[in-house]
């Protein structure tokens, strides 16, 4: 009988608790803690019999307004909680027995994990192994590098090893036990060799007087590099290429033998830059329109080829991309030291008058379409850059002067492009600016001032990327005669900003050697060239 009485007494006073909304030792983010809802179900709760609960938070008894007690348990909806460790406790009074006590300890953590790594990393020689070390907090739920789980030592240290510096940013992501996430990018730039060069068209190299003019500048130590056109603004490939599509579309015009030109220039100690005009390509656009390949071109709103520049090809089209990358790969195989992309953009003008077949746009707004074009330009450079980097060659991109201020107008977002090329070649020709631009009264008459103002803007936009700069310099006259003083002023403005790399531009390949002084031309290692 005594056992029976005791069993009945125990059943009447035993407390079974089920909690939802919080767990002991839980880790909550600030967001989770701001919307916390806790229910404590107490199966044997009998308020009339004296089985009554009292709730405490961080050692303080909660008032009746902060929670609700019913016949089935307690509901607690606290105000947003601060970061730190908290304790929720409950005491239930029982007749003739000590109170039943329960506690739930949990932490509110709204601070994302810290990823401590230097970016950009110091520039390293191209095609050499590189190691990057960093530190993260211990005890993370996950740590990934470019989407793959990464190893971390017991002190939170990590090490990344590469056969060579990868082109483009490396993405690090971390998540702590509370679910807070953090991300960081690592950019590893490569050392870009000192470059002072001139633009040379295929036709100019094939024309004896102009070729001799170029070689005289080389022999006089006026340049350390020569830029040769691989594919020009007219879409013409100026040598006998092995890329079949170039022949099929009628783009080949053999002005020179590429290998012979490269061998001659390298024998004289200068580097060779292969320039490829990417998406401004009349021959490819015409061929595409005549052969039911309209997805290869930018269209007007009536479905025809956009007439600007004689036809602009579509950066979102895989075949167009492949054609350009095939030409770049061939130029590298034949010996160029760099690939310099030009017209790696969309045409300027109202994007609502342009149709990009296959372009993935999240909504129908012009802003979304501009961003999608920007993303495709960047992804093209990332795609080509992987091929170029694998061959231990540099990749550059010529950018319109307005790209720093209005990238969406042409599809050239400077910060993103800077992370996917080895150098930017901004085209800041003084004659191309309107009066008052960058607060320069008469840019064409003030070459130093406009280059200093616009180039510094490019540098600000590219900050954090480690990208090098290689300035296009105006060596031609529009409106105001340009001679040695005007050409030199642009070079000096860049040098005063720490940019000593430059390329002279003259569409007719008739340059001003007297503009170049000995201290302006250096070997790739930065030392002065003999004869300069």
Name these PLM-found stretches.
Residues 225-227, 257-305, 338-342:
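Glycine-rich, aromatic-flanked loop segments that form ligand/cofactor-binding clefts
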Residues 78-85, 161-168, 178:
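Surface-exposed, short loops/turns at beta-strand junctions within beta-sandwich domains
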């Amino acid at each position: 009988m005594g056992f029976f009485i005791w069993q009945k007494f125990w059943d009447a006073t035993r407390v079974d608790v089920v909690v939802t909304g919080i767990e002991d030792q839980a880790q909550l983010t600030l967001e989770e803690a701001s919307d916390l809802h806790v229910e404590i179900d107490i199966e044997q709760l009998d308020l009339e019999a004296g089985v009554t609960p009292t709730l405490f938070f961080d050692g303080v008894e909660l008032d009746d307004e902060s929670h609700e007690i019913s016949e089935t348990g307690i509901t607690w909806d606290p105000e947003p909680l601060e970061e730190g460790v908290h304790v929720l406790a409950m005491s239930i009074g029982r007749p003739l027995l000590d109170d039943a006590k329960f506690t739930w300890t949990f932490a509110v953590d709204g601070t994302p994990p810290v990823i401590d790594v230097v970016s950009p990393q110091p520039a390293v020689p191209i095609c050499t192994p590189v190691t990057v070390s960093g530190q993260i907090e211990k005890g993370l739920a996950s740590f990934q590098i470019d989407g793959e789980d990464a190893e971390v030592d017991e002190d939170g240290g990590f090490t990344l090893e590469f056969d060579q510096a990868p082109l483009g940013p490396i993405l690090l992501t971390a998540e702590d036990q509370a679910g807070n996430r953090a991300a960081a990018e690592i950019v590893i730039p490569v050392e870009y060799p000192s470059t002072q060069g001139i633009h040379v068209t295929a036709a100019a190299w094939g024309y004896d007087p102009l070729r001799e003019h170029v070689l005289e500048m080389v022999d006089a130590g006026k340049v350390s590099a020569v830029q040769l056109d691989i594919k020009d603004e007219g879409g013409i490939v100026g040598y006998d290429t092995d890329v079949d599509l170039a022949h099929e579309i009628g783009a080949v015009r053999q002005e020179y033998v590429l290998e012979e030109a490269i061998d001659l220039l390298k024998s004289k100690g200068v580097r060779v830059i292969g320039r490829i005009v990417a998406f401004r390509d009349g021959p490819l656009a015409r061929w595409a329109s005549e052969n039911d390949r309209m997805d290869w071109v930018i269209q007007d709103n009536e479905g025809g080829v956009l007439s600007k520049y004689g036809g602009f090809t579509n950066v979102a089209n895989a075949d167009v991309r492949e054609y350009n990358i095939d030409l770049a790969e061939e130029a590298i195989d034949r010996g160029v030291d760099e690939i310099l992309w030009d017209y790696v953009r969309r045409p300027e003008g109202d994007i609502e008058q342009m149709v990009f077949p296959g372009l993935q746009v999240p909504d129908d707004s012009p802003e979304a379409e501009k961003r999608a074009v920007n993303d495709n330009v960047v992804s093209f450079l990332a795609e080509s850059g992987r091929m170029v980097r694998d061959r231990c060659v540099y990749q550059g991109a010529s950018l319109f002067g307005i790209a720093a201020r209005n990238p969406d107008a042409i599809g050239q977002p400077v910060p993103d492009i800077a992370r996917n090329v080895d150098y930017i070649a901004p085209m800041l020709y003084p004659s191309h600016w309107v009066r008052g631009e960058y607060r320069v009264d008469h840019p064409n008459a003030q070459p130093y001032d406009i280059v200093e103002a616009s180039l510094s803007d490019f540098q600000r936009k590219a900050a954090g990327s480690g990208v090098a700069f290689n300035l296009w310099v105006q060596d031609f006259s529009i409106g105001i005669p340009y001679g040695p003083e005007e050409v030199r002023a642009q070079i000096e403005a860049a040098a005063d900003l720490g940019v000593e790399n430059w390329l002279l531009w003259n569409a007719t390949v008739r340059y001003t050697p007297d503009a170049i002084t000995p201290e302006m031309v250096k070997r790739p290692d930065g030392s002065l060239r003999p004869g300069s």
